[in-house]
A protein has these predicted regions:
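PEST-like low-complexity, intrinsically disordered acidic/proline/serine-rich tracts
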Residues: 2-3, 25-252
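Bacterial N-terminal signal peptides
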Residues: 8-19, 23
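N-terminal low-hydrophobic presequence detector
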Residues: 1-5, 9
């Protein structure tokens, strides 16, 4: 009788433990909320970066002369627009920022500052033209009036590691639409409001301690381009923002 009573008491005492374990097991089996894009970032792109111009000097560091359209796959309609380029007219019309839109802004020399606007939106501010770009993960901004920076939809691209190992890294892909017509170069080489800008942001760490950001930009435009216009822009990580000096747009 004593043995049976002891067994019953033991079962009763163990019941809360078993019940608690079951609740823990059930909770562990429940689907967990997906991490935010900020928490899931495979690479840190935040900070101040300064553009390092090592190629296309004649089109980036100075305003090229009218008619210098080399390497851009322009349609006849694009050439007609570019041949009529008039920076004074653009300034008078309030369109001095035509060369500072999403199709070309990463090619304009200067610094950029990347921060998180919130857990689902990366923000890029530029010294040149004092522009702000918002890269939204998951859902693009609601359709509205076309703008210089348009509407940008972002997604992380994860690089695979070895089997069973965590991801080795990754990059950022951004697709921008909803653009206001602008210039690919300051001498009037145009892109239309139908253009689609696809960008890839890759960060690299060099053995000497330097950190680089390489932005590959692909512009597609059924109106003004015969093919894809692809460029790569290089930025070096800056220690801080002490040299940050935003400047207004200039048409020439």
């Amino acid at each position: 009788m004593r043995t049976r009573a002891a067994f019953v008491i033991g079962v009763l005492l163990a019941a809360p433990v078993v019940s608690g374990f079951s609740r823990t097991l059930i909770a562990a089996q429940q689907p967990q909320p997906a991490p935010t894009p900020r928490a899931a970032a495979p690479v840190d792109l935040t900070g101040y970066w300064i553009s390092i111009v090592t190629e296309d000097w004649r089109w980036r560091m100075v305003t090229p002369p009218k008619g210098d359209y080399a390497s851009v796959p322009m349609t006849p309609a694009a050439r007609k627009v570019a041949d009529g380029w008039d920076p004074k007219r653009d300034t008078a019309a309030g369109e001095a920022c035509r060369a500072y839109g999403a199709g070309a802004i990463m090619r304009v020399p200067g610094r950029i500052h990347i921060t998180w606007e919130n857990d689902t939106t990366l923000r890029v501010d530029t010294e040149a033209g004092t522009q702000t770009r918002l890269f939204r993960f998951g859902t693009a901004a609601p359709a509205g009036e076309p703008s210089w920076q348009g509407r940008s939809l972002a997604q992380w691209q994860i690089s695979g590691g070895r089997r069973g190992a965590p991801p080795a890294g990754g990059s950022l892909k951004v697709v921008t639409t909803g653009l206001r017509a602008g210039y690919l170069r300051k001498n009037g080489v145009p892109y239309s409001a139908n253009a689609i800008v696809t960008e890839y942001y890759n960060r690299t760490n060099e053995p000497n301690g330097d950190t680089w950001l390489v932005v590959t930009t692909v512009v597609e435009d059924p109106v003004y381009l015969n093919g894809r216009f692809v460029t790569s822009s290089h930025f070096k990580k800056a220690a801080d923002g002490s040299a940050w000096k935003p400047t207004p747009c200039e048409a020439s």
